[in-house]
Design a protein with these regions (language model features):
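Residue-level detector of anion-binding/catalytic polar loops
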Residues: 96, 122-123
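Donor-nucleotide binding loops and adjacent catalytic segments primarily
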Residues: 1-80, 111-115, 119, 126-136
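C-terminal alpha-helical cap of glycosyltransferases
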Residues: 162-180
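A short, well-ordered alpha-helix in the C-terminal region of glycosyltransferases
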Residues: 149-163
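Conserved donor-binding loops in enzymes that form glycosidic bonds
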Residues: 7-8, 159, 172
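A donor-sugar binding/catalytic signature common to diverse glycosyltransferases
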Residues: 68-110
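Two-component system phosphotransfer/interaction surface
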Residues: 131-145, 170, 174
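A ubiquitous structural signal for well-ordered alpha-helices
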Residues: 21, 48, 139, 153-156, ...
Length: 180
């Protein structure tokens, strides 16, 4: 399953880029898509896709998803923004991803986040202003179609994980609390 989302409010450019590839995505008979558009974008995306009943069985549109953990756990691949919370969730589950940093994020931190993932081999990255490009399409379909690409990303993501994260975080919290 391909999960597409842009954070809790959605991401219009991601929505538009994925909608533009509707026919090519649906040409893959085993591909199911869960597309979380953002509440304000749901009607526009629904209208733009104009899914038939058969297509709607494979392309599930939601304005918002409050059970994101379960949705992420079901994903084989993800297209999303590169915010810290999204990446923490994606990382914990080692899900292959195509990251699209939000270009107006403070200090461009989402690009910094995504770049670290790309350098480790755990994700692809595409700048927001290049979402309509052939490169976006090539990366998306490599993610969907090539099991070895996904397997490599999973292995890279797992190599980044630490089993000591909770203990390290607790040490920081205790250190800050006792310094007061």
């Amino acid at each position: 399953m391909l999960l597409v989302f842009g954070g809790s409010l959605g991401a219009r450019h991601i929505n538009e880029a994925v909608v533009a590839l509707k026919d090519e995505l649906l040409a893959r008979p085993n591909l199911h898509i869960v597309h979380i558009t953002g509440p304000k974008e749901l009607d526009a995306v629904t209208e733009a896709l104009a899914l038939t009943d058969d297509e709607a069985r494979r392309w599930h549109l939601l304005g918002y998803q409050d059970r994101m953990g379960e949705t992420l756990a079901a994903a084989d691949a993800i297209v999303s923004r590169a915010g810290a919370t999204s990446l923490a969730e994606i990382s914990a589950l080692a899900i292959p991803a195509l990251l699209v940093p939000y270009p107006l994020a403070t200090a461009d931190h989402q690009t910094t986040n995504a770049r670290a993932w790309v350098e480790s081999g755990a994700a692809f990255m595409m700048p927001d202003d290049e979402l309509g490009s052939d490169e976006f399409k090539a990366k998306l379909f490599a993610l969907i179609d090539d099991a070895s690409v996904r397997e490599g990303m999973v292995a890279a993501a797992r190599a980044q994980q630490t089993g000591e994260a909770a203990a390290a975080l607790a040490d920081v919290v205790v250190g800050v609390a006792t310094a007061r």
